[in-house]
Amino acid sequence: MIFDKDNFQEYDKELWDAIHAEEERQEHNIELIASENVVSKAVMKAQGTLLTNKYAEGYPGKRYYGGTEWVDVVENLAIERAKTLFGAKFANVQAHSGSQANAAAYMALIESGDTVLGMDLAAGGHLTHGSPVNFSGKTYNFVGYSVDKETEMLDYEAILEQAKEVKPKLIVAGASAYSRIIDFKKFREIADEVGAYLMVDMAHIAGLVATGLHPSPVAYADVTTSTTHKTLRGPRGGLILTNDEGLAKKINSAVFPGLQGGPLEHVIAAKAVSFKEALDPAFTDYAKQVVANTAAMANVFAEDNRFRLISGGTDNHVFLVEVTGVIESGKAAQNLLDEVNITLNKNSIPFETLSPFKTSGIRIGCAAITSRGMGVEESQQIAQLIIKALVNHDNSSILEEVRQEVRTITDRFPLYENL
């Protein structure tokens, strides 16, 4: 007999209370962490189905277990929708995360110890792009490229010269904290000139790529990886795309059996839902609003000389602000804003002088507030509230004013109706 407790709240009150408290936090906080979003009820419902019961090692039509005819349907739906959404010939939807998608791509493309050119973490890259504390930096010989010191934007000529010098087997393009358009065609040209593979990690911009608001890397990269959350607004998970059949086979083998065992078919179902949502014209409207909101918010900081907007602006869903003109560090800013129910993260800026545990900057993204229905006016208001709080960080009465103004905004834009 199945052990079941219908009344979850009564059966496990301690856990229920923690979940409920998080629900309240999300409801009454302004979420500006660039890697976070608000998924649909359909995505949550798919992820909560009994598909979680099913083991399905292998791939559709080639499983190591029986009873997989319906999870094959689910996974094939996710695969075909991902291919349609991004214009790719092959898709792997089994990677549990973006980091595992990147690990699988590396396994398919290069060998341990090979030289890889990736974006330096302090310049806007990701841990999996060669950080020495990450598996990528421990397994491969990563060399970091940065941004131009004056413009704080990618300098493709400098990257080409660096590539000629280090002769990488692989070049990784993509970022976790870069606010400008990335020219994937130029990266392809650089890779071709030095005889390297090109891998693009589009985790942060996938929703913008899907809607044509950022140039797609799929036609230029040997392999494209992504998460399925962030701007794509799906469940937490990974995705790998390629147009090369030989690489597709290597990628599949790298994911299973190379890195993972059984796929999370309930999460794959949620991915399928989110891909369907992203194919809807309404998602393009959403993505356009994300870009508009981000630009509007960034402009408020650009017009205030107490702050410095990194690279002078933004073309996507994210931007960085140097805050040390008004408060000790990015960490201090993050902690202070937590107190007034505005959530964002400290972030290193290019050519950072403080430790990564303190930082000079903060990172701000608008994907989540846009999902709640907020627009340009609210984005500008939120930027002004951030400035008000940071400038008056030692004034408790003003901080209380900010907290109340935040509550007024969140009350106007409920997280979910009748959750």
From Swiss-Prot:
Bilayer-crossing regions: none
Residue list for modification N6-(pyridoxal phosphate)lysine: K230
Molecular-function GO terms, alphabetical: glycine hydroxymethyltransferase activity; pyridoxal phosphate binding
Residues the entry annotates as binding (6S)-5,6,7,8-tetrahydrofolate: L121, G125, H126, L127, S355, P356, F357
Subcellular locations according to the entry: Cytoplasm
Alphabetical GO biological process terms: glycine biosynthetic process from serine; tetrahydrofolate interconversion
Root EC class: transferase
Known partners and oligomeric status: Homodimer.
Function: Catalyzes the reversible interconversion of serine and glycine with tetrahydrofolate (THF) serving as the one-carbon carrier. This reaction serves as the major source of one-carbon groups required for the biosynthesis of purines, thymidylate, methionine, and other important biomolecules. Also exhibits THF-independent aldolase activity toward beta-hydroxyamino acids, producing glycine and aldehydes, via a retro-aldol mechanism.
Protein name listed in UniProt: Serine hydroxymethyltransferase
Native source organism of the sequence: Streptococcus uberis (strain ATCC BAA-854 / 0140J)
